[in-house]
Regions:
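Acidic/polar, glycine-enriched structural segments that form the non-catalytic walls/loops
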Residues: 1-40, 127-129, 138-143, 199-200, ...
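Catalytic cores of carbohydrate-active enzymes
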Residues: 3-7, 22-25, 88-89, 148-156, ...
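Aromatic-rich carbohydrate-recognition surfaces in CAZymes
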Residues: 40-155, 182-185, 189, 267, ...
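Long, repeat-rich segments with strong aromatic
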Residues: 194, 201, 217-221, 278-280, ...
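Non-catalytic C-terminal accessory modules of carbohydrate-active enzymes
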Residues: 289-298, 307-309, 322-323, 336-410
């Protein structure tokens, strides 16, 4: 374990300055790319979590100062490319944006932009640089409120483009506006809490209360609609229901009284309900005992399967566009599940998945000199995209935890 931790730390320290980029075209501010192999690109949740990871390695004031303009610039570049409707491209390069959300008919950036902004503010101990951008943050959240919110109180993906967990069966190839994704809703809950905290620090007290209340309402909706008492797990829900027609005699005697249907597909993102602090303690206990620890569902020697081994859609293969989220081990799902376990006091299990991740990545660095994008849950072999960095760098935060050291938190 110590050998692997040292190999990983050496590798990250050698690579971290290679992810800094100078202003270019549509990216007018200095910025961080999600890995050294990226030329001039920012991606929504990749950039956020890469920043969290790299920040953990900055141990001196000199290093922090050197990175600070790149951290702020990453957020500012997203906001500078906001469309008139308030959506933000999920990816922007120096030359173009890769997104069709301007039309309102396709997904834009996921709700992580505000969280990224809050992270940078807290890491640098400075909110002042964000004051002039505050209206844009509000506009971004209002876009989701206006275009992506269902009558149930849950939010939905417009389509299956760039959802982050590319081919999650709950959204992939599903009809437009039908997926009340647990992944999306947990991110949105944290996004609203982040906006509340930013509002408070900038002196917008009414907004602070507004966003707190919006977060509370969303939490209640997630608990009501997404937790399944039978299986003890949080799921995405199907919103693709026909409207109630009380004029039709064959339905009018007892029309539907529900506005969502749980899609009981075991996807790792159910654990984001723990990461976000949405699950109750008793729900978390069931999630861990009845789901996480089951080797025929999520549990493996190398971390958490991204899709249950028992699902018909389970598949381990190399693919791109979409990348495969149908079971392989990903660094980001291991990390966020690690944080979820810590939040609810499952410290031994958190330690275990951290050790599994360090061993998995350490062996990869030892054998290949770098990381892969995702891994086989049965063998630990890298499957795709050798040289991938991005959120895999969060293993640094896990190493700090295992060493009993403080670590940066998203």
């Amino acid at each position: 374990m110590k050998k692997y931790a040292e190999l990983i730390t050496k590798y990250i320290n050698e690579q971290k300055y290679k992810i800094l980029r100078e202003p270019s075209g549509k990216l007018p501010h200095k910025f961080i790319v999600p890995g050294a192999c990226y030329a001039q690109e920012i991606w929504d949740w990749d950039s956020w979590l890469t920043d969290v990871a790299i920040s953990n390695t900055l141990k001196t004031d000199e290093e922090k100062n050197a990175f600070s303009e790149y951290q702020k610039g990453c957020v500012l570049n997203f906001l500078d490319n906001m469309y008139d409707n308030g959506s933000i491209p999920f990816m922007t390069s120096g030359e173009s944006t890769f997104c069709e959300s301007e039309s309102g008919e396709s997904n834009g950036a996921k709700p992580v932009i505000v969280q990224h902004a809050l992270f940078v503010c807290k890491f640098l101990g400075d909110f002042s640089w964000l004051k002039d951008q505050y209206a844009k943050l509000k506009k971004f959240l209002n876009y989701y409120e206006t275009n992506c919110k269902h009558e149930s109180g849950l939010y939905f993906f417009i389509d299956d483009w760039a959802i982050g967990v590319d081919n999650d069966p709950c959204t992939f190839y599903r009809p437009k506006r039908s997926s009340g994704s647990i992944y999306l809703n947990c991110l949105m809950y944290k996004e609203l809490l982040a906006m509340s905290e930013i509002s408070e620090n900038l002196g917008y007290n009414e907004d602070n209360i507004l966003y707190q209340n919006m977060a509370k309402s969303l939490k209640s909706a997630i608990q009501e609609h997404c937790f399944d008492e039978r299986n003890g797990f949080y799921y995405s829900v199907d919103l693709d229901l026909l409207p109630i027609d009380n004029s039709h005699w064959i339905h009018m005697g007892c029309p539907r009284h529900w506005n969502t249907l749980i899609r009981k597909i075991d996807v790792w993102s159910g654990f984001l309900a723990m990461w976000a602090g949405i699950a109750t303690q008793s729900q978390a206990e069931r999630m861990v005992k009845e789901n996480y620890l089951k080797s025929n569902i999520f549990y493996s020697d190398y971390g958490i399967r991204t899709l249950s081994k028992s699902e018909k859609m389970y598949l381990i293969k190399e693919s791109g566009n979409p990348s495969c989220w149908l079971g392989p081990i990903w660094g980001v799902s291991n990390y966020l599940t690690f944080k979820a376990l810590l939040k609810y006091g499952y410290n031994d299990l958190a330690k275990e998945i951290a050790e599994k991740t360090v061993t998995l990545f350490g062996r990869d660095v030892e054998n290949c000199g770098e990381f892969h994008e995702y891994y086989d849950p049965e063998t630990g072999e890298g499957i795709s995209n050798q040289g991938f960095q991005s959120w895999n760098l969060l293993v640094s935060n896990m190493i700090s935890y295992l060493n009993g050291e403080p670590f940066t938190e998203e």
